[in-house]
Amino acid sequence: MALLKISVVVPEGEVYTGEVRSVVLPGVEGEFGVLYGHSNMITLLQAGVIEIETESQKEHIAISWGYAEVTGEHVDILADGAVFIKKESDDRDDAISRAKRLLEDASSDRLAVSSVLAKIESL
């Protein structure tokens, strides 16, 4: 299976870059998945969690909102704010706390935020 290149960038710099099997993005019309060979598109992202599947594990990045440019070979994400939640990390609890604050500040829609927060707590 061919790998998709992905980068997540915020105003402060790069949060994540790598080659992945798939990525699930929190689009404003709902979550959508991207695999290698996807049709080209540019879309708006809402506050939520980006789910990244590498060859060996799943990784998660919480974002406040942003834009995604998708081509057949890569996904470039420009986000207003992002927190990379590493699965096996000493500062994982701190990252989850920062992700919760980021999402709570990003949206006034309490129902949407609570469902995303529940998703983060289950990681």
Curated annotation (Swiss-Prot):
One of its GO terms (molecular function) is ATP binding. CDD domains: F1-ATPase_delta. InterPro entries: ATP_synth_F1_dsu/esu (IPR001469), ATP_synth_F1_dsu/esu_N (IPR020546), ATPsynth_dsu/esu_N (IPR036771). It is a peripheral membrane protein. Keywords: ATP synthesis, Cell inner membrane, Cell membrane, CF(1), Hydrogen ion transport, Ion transport, Membrane, Transport. It is found in: Cell inner membrane. Its main location: membrane. Disulfide bonds: none annotated. GO terms for cellular component: plasma membrane; proton-transporting ATP synthase complex. It holds the Pfam family ATP-synt_DE_N. Belongs to the ATPase epsilon chain family. NCBIfam families: ATP_synt_epsi (TIGR01216). Produces ATP from ADP in the presence of a proton gradient across the membrane. F-type ATPases have 2 components, CF(1) - the catalytic core - and CF(0) - the membrane proton channel. CF(1) has five subunits: alpha(3), beta(3), gamma(1), delta(1), epsilon(1). CF(0) has three main subunits: a, b and c. This is ATP synthase epsilon chain. The gene is atpC.
